[in-house]
């Protein structure tokens, strides 16, 4: 469970952040009660030029500067259309090239989600039934249908430059329809498995180096663990890697299992 104040306190984000932004992009103003009992109301304006932005200062402060008691948020019209399309790429690099081009072309997708080959094999195959090996990429657009169709047409052209298979709109829609299924049994991790999750954002020029640096470190130092990752939040200049290390069969002794888990984190 979560609350609006919780979203603000930890700078939360959602599935459609690529178009609609994170919580700090959605908030206009807030009321905050400070540790001294003072009440601060930030200005309900889109931008200002009168010193530091207190609204942004409180976003992500995780309760250290005060408790958010009220918030004024942006609202958006419900889109007339929302459409999805999916592609399979031979490897993550080809998919990343396509994803980066979707963003630098300023097409404004509402979502892009790229799964590396390992996570495609481990989760996408099981949830969506894709049999072929590769890196799975899905994107979507929403808004007025005529505009969405134009955006989709150009995005499909971009992906066809490096993809090995056009999975079509049905497989894209299937991802949207089942996007929360990944977090429920039997698809989510179960005992005795152990795993850790890392969120890292970088520019398009560096994000693949970050990915391979993490993956190779886990592979070389901890052969008993596997590394999977997907890229879930995209920006004009880069994207976020949602990476996981997984220990399918940790040591049966709890102290040894905890020690192994902590060593991976400390790497």
Regions found by a protein language model. Name each.
Residues 266-267:
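Double-stranded beta-helix
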Residues 1-113:
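FAD-binding subdomain of flavoenzyme oxidoreductases
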Residues 77, 88, 94-263:
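C-terminal substrate-recognition/cap domain of FAD-linked oxidoreductases
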